């Protein structure tokens, strides 16, 4: 039962970190009339 909770917390933390990095504005790519893939 404890393993399920620890696994859920681990996956949730990694998911939040991945979400923050993936949807972060790319600092090295200036937008010059080109629509970025990450933003809607």
Swiss-Prot record:
GO cellular component, one term: photosystem II reaction center
Cysteine-cysteine disulfides: none
Family matches, as HAMAP family: PSII_PsbT (MF_00808)
Lineage: superkingdom: Eukaryota
Organism for this UniProt entry: Anthoceros angustus
Biological process per Gene Ontology, one example term: photosynthesis
Main function: Found at the monomer-monomer interface of the photosystem II (PS II) dimer, plays a role in assembly and dimerization of PSII. PSII is a light-driven water plastoquinone oxidoreductase, using light energy to abstract electrons from H(2)O, generating a proton gradient subsequently used for ATP formation.
Transmembrane segments: 3-23
Localization, UniProt: Plastid, Chloroplast thylakoid membrane
Quaternary structure (record): PSII is composed of 1 copy each of membrane proteins PsbA, PsbB, PsbC, PsbD, PsbE, PsbF, PsbH, PsbI, PsbJ, PsbK, PsbL, PsbM, PsbT, PsbY, PsbZ, Psb30/Ycf12, at least 3 peripheral proteins of the oxygen-evolving complex and a large number of cofactors. It forms dimeric complexes.
UniProt key word Ribosomal protein: no
Keyword field: Chloroplast, Membrane, Photosynthesis, Photosystem II, Plastid, Thylakoid, Transmembrane, Transmembrane helix
Annotated membrane topology: Single-pass membrane protein
Protein's name in the database: Photosystem II reaction center protein T
Family assignment from sequence similarity: Belongs to the PsbT family.
């Amino acid at each position: 039962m404890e393993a399920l909770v620890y696994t859920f917390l681990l996956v949730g933390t990694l998911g939040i970190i991945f979400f923050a990095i993936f949807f972060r504005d790319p600092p090295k790519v200036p937008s010059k009339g080109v629509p970025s893939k990450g933003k809607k």
